């Protein structure tokens, strides 16, 4: 067992090192860029070393535990620890954030503040995935909003302030329910509030209170995930934000909602989750179809990709609602798979938009001729998104399918109906993605574009794309590498679940 504070270092390093950006010499943006990338690489290397040498995969319990008294008056502790559920999300955060800083290379306006906000976001995300105290979890959840709001409102399209305001209103509204749930859970049955997750797992509640707590947390997570009808901030935000910010939103921020749903609702409130799980499966199936049909009607290709993200989140919801080992592992696999694929699609959309200065599909066409590398990578990641066999999206969705089919909670006819709806959603996915590719890259409208001096992907962009493409292919060919991280922890979670 390691007593070195690995997780505390991982949480505080980005934001503290990021604050030094403002003291760097003002000799252009190059120093700031290289400094930020160096911090992200150092963080990722420390993370990889700590997990390789101090984390035991076969142990399903919480590891790398840290427990220090923080605020003595409230008996508030700094509790950190990780298990198989959080390990993959932390590694995904490190990988995507490092590449997002590389993607943000062209940012020159207020670059010091931009990179600092990215690093502050990094700290908040690592803190959330590794927290073992519900109040600390909530604090990290809220701290995340500040850098995201500033990144959305200061860098992006013409309507960026509108989209940032919409984002903060939705998420802050959900956080009110989150805070009420945290207070209710901490104060119930005790004069002294205690929010240690280890203690809360063994806490029992009256049925009505448990349902109310579950519903309050669900609203907060439904905004972040997002779950319809609380999803409307997402297309506006992705349509206006800078593409490096979109990578962090699609790759990590949406996954925080799914992680919270597993970590808090499923682990701490099993009775309520058992009651709500059929509704989660129904909502997930409806979301797959609704978002796919809505995506098909979008003229803005950034918003089309945003709605495809909403559709793919439906598989995560179904996996969580299935209450099976296979289904929950499939949901975790989909979290990681979509983290890679979604982030890259938004990066490609942003780089293409920067070159063309156009976002409406009817104005595009024929750009595969001057930009063959972007066309090749866009096509490859679109194939991954539509679940082409051999890529991570296919394995994740297939495992969720099997999880639903083998679920003992549902009768045969409802399972067949939900599976049929999911299959229709999988058929709609190639329709809206391939039609987008056809409208963007084929045809003869290239000559109507004002700026004809197109430049194809450079070495930096190709390096970034290949770095993400390798794990997408790797997971598709050998998914057990990722499933082995969570399978033991999921088994323990569900065994406790059914005994309760």
From Swiss-Prot:
Q: Where in the cell is it found?
A: Plastid, Chloroplast thylakoid membrane
Primary localization? plastid
Q: How does it sit in the membrane?
A: Multi-pass membrane protein
* Record EC number: 7.1.1.-
Q: Keyword Calcium: yes or no?
A: no
What transmembrane ranges does the database entry give?
4-24, 35-55, 87-107, 111-131, 134-154, 167-187, 211-231, 242-262, 274-294, 313-333, 334-354, 386-406, 417-437, 462-482
**Superkingdom of the source?**
Eukaryota
What are this entry's molecular-function GO terms?
A: NADH dehydrogenase (ubiquinone) activity; ubiquinone binding
Could you confirm whether the keyword Secreted appears in this record?
Answer: no
List, alphabetically, the InterPro entries matched: NADH_Q_OxRdtase_chain4, NADH_Q_OxRdtase_chainM/4, NADH_UbQ_OxRdtase, ND/Mrp_TM
- Where is it found, in Gene Ontology cellular component terms? chloroplast thylakoid membrane
Q: What class of enzyme is it?
A: translocase
Q: Kindly state which keywords UniProt assigns to this record, in alphabetical order.
A: Chloroplast, Membrane, NAD, NADP, Plastid, Plastoquinone, Quinone, Thylakoid, Translocase, Transmembrane, Transmembrane helix
Gene Ontology biological process terms from the UniProt entry: ATP synthesis coupled electron transport; electron transport coupled proton transport
List the PANTHER family.
NAD(P)H-QUINONE OXIDOREDUCTASE CHAIN 4, CHLOROPLASTIC, NADH-UBIQUINONE OXIDOREDUCTASE CHAIN 4
Q: What family is it from? A: Belongs to the complex I subunit 4 family.
Under which name does UniProt file this protein? NAD(P)H-quinone oxidoreductase chain 4, chloroplastic
Q: Where does this protein come from, organism-wise? A: Saccharum hybrid (Sugarcane)
Q: What is the lineage of its organism?
A: Eukaryota, Viridiplantae, Streptophyta, Embryophyta, Tracheophyta
Q: Which gene is transcribed and translated to give this protein?
A: ndhD
């Amino acid at each position: 067992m390691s007593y070195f504070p690995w997780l505390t270092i991982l949480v505080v390093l980005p934001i503290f090192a990021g604050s030094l950006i403002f003291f760097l010499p003002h000799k252009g943006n190059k120093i700031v860029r290289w400094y930020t990338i160096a911090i992200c690489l150092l963080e990722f290397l420390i993370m990889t070393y700590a997990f390789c040498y101090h984390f035991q995969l076969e142990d399903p319990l919480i590891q790398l535990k840290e427990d220090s008294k923080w605020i003595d008056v409230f008996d508030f502790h700094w509790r950190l620890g990780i298990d198989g559920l959080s390990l993959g999300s932390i590694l995904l955060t490190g990988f995507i954030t490092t590449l997002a800083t590389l993607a943000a290379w062209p940012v020159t306006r207020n670059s010091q503040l931009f990179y600092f906000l990215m690093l502050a976001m990094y700290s908040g995300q690592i803190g959330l995935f590794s927290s073992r105290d519900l109040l600390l979890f909530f604090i990290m959840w809220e701290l995340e909003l500040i850098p995201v709001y500033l990144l959305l409102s200061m860098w992006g399209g013409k309507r960026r302030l509108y989209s940032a305001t919409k984002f903060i209103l939705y998420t802050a509204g959900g956080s009110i329910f989150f805070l009420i749930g945290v207070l209710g859970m901490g104060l119930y049955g005790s004069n002294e509030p205690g929010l240690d997750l280890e203690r809360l797992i063994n806490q029992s509640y009256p049925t009505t209170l448990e349902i109310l707590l579950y519903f309050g947390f669900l609203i907060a997570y439904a905004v972040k995930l997002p779950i319809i009808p609380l999803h409307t901030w997402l297309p506006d935000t992705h349509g206006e934000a800078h593409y490096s910010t979109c990578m962090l939103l699609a790759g990590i921020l949406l996954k925080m909602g799914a992680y919270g749903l597993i970590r808090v609702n499923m682990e701490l409130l099993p009775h309520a989750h058992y009651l709500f799980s059929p509704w989660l499966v129904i909502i997930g199936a409806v979301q797959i179809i609704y978002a796919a049909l809505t995506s098909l009607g979008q003229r803005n290709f950034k918003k089309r990709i945003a709605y495809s993200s909403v559709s793919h989140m439906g598989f995560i919801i179904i996996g969580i609602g299935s209450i099976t080992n296979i289904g929950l592992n499939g949901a975790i696999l989909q979290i990681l798979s979509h983290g890679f694929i979604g982030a890259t699609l938004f990066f490609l959309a942003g780089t293409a938009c920067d070159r063309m200065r156009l976002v409406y599909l009817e104005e595009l066409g024929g750009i595969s001729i001057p930009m063959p590398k972007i066309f090749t990578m866009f096509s490859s990641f679109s194939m991954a998104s539509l679940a082409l066999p051999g890529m991570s999206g296919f394995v994740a969705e297939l495992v969720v399918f099997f999880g639903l089919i083998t679920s003992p909670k549902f009768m045969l006819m409802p399972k067949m109906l939900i599976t049929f709806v999911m299959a229709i959603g999988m058929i709609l996915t190639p329709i809206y993605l391939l039609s987008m590719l056809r409208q963007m890259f084929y045809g003869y409208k290239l000559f109507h574009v004002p700026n004809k001096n197109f430049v194809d992907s450079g070495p930096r962009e190709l390096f970034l794309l290949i770095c993400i493409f390798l794990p997408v292919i790797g997971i598709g060919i050998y998914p057990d590498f990722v499933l082995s991280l969570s399978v033991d922890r999921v088994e323990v979670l569900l065994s406790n679940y059914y005994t309760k």
